[in-house]
Amino acid sequence: MVMDIWTISLRILLFPSALVLCSDSFHSECYTVNGADYRGTQNQTSLDGGKPCLFWNETFQHPYNTLKYPNGEGGLGEHNYCRNPDGDVSPWCYIPEQEDGVYWKYCDIPACKMPGNLGCFRDHGNPPPLTGISETSNKQTIQTCITMCRRQRYKLAGLEAGFACFCGNNADYRKHGEMPSTDCNSVCFGDHTQPCGGDGRIILFDSLIGACGGNYSTDSAVIYSPDFPDTYGTGKACYWTIQVTDASIIRFNFTLFDIKDSRDMVELLDGYTKQVLIRFDGRNHPTHSFNISLDFVILYFFSDRINQAQGFSVVYEAFKEETIEKPNGSNNPSQTEMITQTTNLSINAARSSKILYVITTSPSRPSGHVPGWTIYALTGLLILTIIAISAKALLHISMKSARLASSSSLDSCHRGSAGEIWSIFYKPSTSISIFPKKLKGQHDDRNPLVGE
C-alpha cells in the first residue's frame, strides 16, 4: 500500500529511535463530541430528503454570516456547508424560513461522529438498551456518566433526556434500531454544548473515552485526554502504552490539541529506554502527523494545578516497513516543515547535557533529491565539523592550515562543558554550520519515567 507521506529520518547511535516528519495522512469528519471541528461538505440537513442549507455569505439577517465573521471563524465561508460556529450540540445551518418561523435546523451527518460515540438508538424502556446501573443528575455531562460506568467496570455508557445515565455491557444495544444523530441532541444539563440523548433516545459511548491511562496493542486507535470531552482536570499524570507486535513505524496525528498552559504537556517516550522523543505543551503545538520508528511507545500527559482546557485527541496507526513509500512531491510546495527534538546524552555524559536537533527541508523537492544522510554517533559529528571548518578555511588559508584548524576545533568540541547544547542545522544543497547554543527557558522534565 502506498502511503501519501513525505519523510526525513535522523538516526543517531546516541539516541537509537528515529523520529520522522511527514504530511498529514489521517482524516476524519469529527473528533469533537459536538462536531465543532466539522469541515465537511454536507449542504443539507439530511442526506435523505433534508432541507437545503443557505449560503453563509447570504444570511446577513441572521447572527452568523461571513460579514460578521470574515476570516473563516467557525468554518464559515462562501459556501452552504453545515457548521457549528456557536458551539451548539451539533452542526447546523440556516434554511429557507418555514411557515412556523423555523429558520435553522441541525444537520444529521453520519460521518460526523467522534470515535467512541457509538450512535443514537431507540430506548423502549423494557428492557433498556443498557441493563447495568443507572442514575440521574441535574449536572449530567458525557464524561460524568462515562466515569461512573468505567469505575463500575462497564464497557458502555449511555445518556438520555439530558440528565439520565445508564451503564452496561449489552452487545445487542442496536436491537431496537439506530436513529438519526439529531434525535439525541437534547443538551446535557451539566454542559449545554454536549448532546445527552433525547426522549426515548439514548446516545452511547465507549467507556474508555477520557480515561487517565491505558494499554493499547491494536494496529490503530484514538486516545483522548483525561476527562474528555469535558476539560481535563488539574494535577493529572497519565500514561498510555502503545505496543504493536511486528510494527516498524507508529504514526501519530493529533486531530485536536487545546492545551493553553505552558506547564501542561504531552510527551512521547521510547517504551524501552524511557527517553523522551518529543514534547508538546501550551506554547509548542503539534502541526503535522509524524512517525516514530518503534513498536513500543509511551504517551504521557501532565497537567499542573492551575488552568484547564479541552485537551487532545490523538490517532495512532502502526505500519510494517514495507508498507511505507515516499511520494514524488507534496501538496504545499512553499511550506517548509521543521521538527525539533531534545534528547539525553550518552550514559556517561552529565545529566544536564542535552542535544538539540533541528532538521529542515522542503516537501516539494522530489524524493530523489532528498539526501539519504544517516549520522552515526560521534563519527557523524566529527565529519560534519571537519567539512564545515575546512570549507571556510579554504577561502583564506592553505590546506595545511585548514587541517590544523579542523584539529583544533575538534579538540575544543571535546572540551565543551556538560551543560552546553549543540545545534545542527541541515538543509539540502546549502552550507552546514555547527555552533554551541544555550537553550533558554527549558523547564526540568517532570516525567517520572525519565531518570534524574
UniProtKB/Swiss-Prot annotation:
Record InterPro entries: CUB_dom, Kremen, Kremen_rcpt, Kringle, Kringle-like, Kringle_CS, Kringle_sf, Sperma_CUB_dom_sf
SUPFAM superfamilies: Kringle-like, Spermadhesin, CUB domain
Carbohydrate attachment residues: N43, N57, N215, N253, N291, N328, N344
One of the GO biological process terms: Wnt signaling pathway
Entry protein name: Kremen protein 1
Name of encoding gene: kremen1
Keywords: Cell membrane, Disulfide bond, Glycoprotein, Kringle, Membrane, Signal, Transmembrane, Transmembrane helix, Wnt signaling pathway
Record's keyword annotation contains Nucleotide-binding: no
Subcellular location: Cell membrane
Residue intervals of the WSC domain: 114-208
Residue ranges occupied by any Kringle domain in the UniProt entry: 29-112
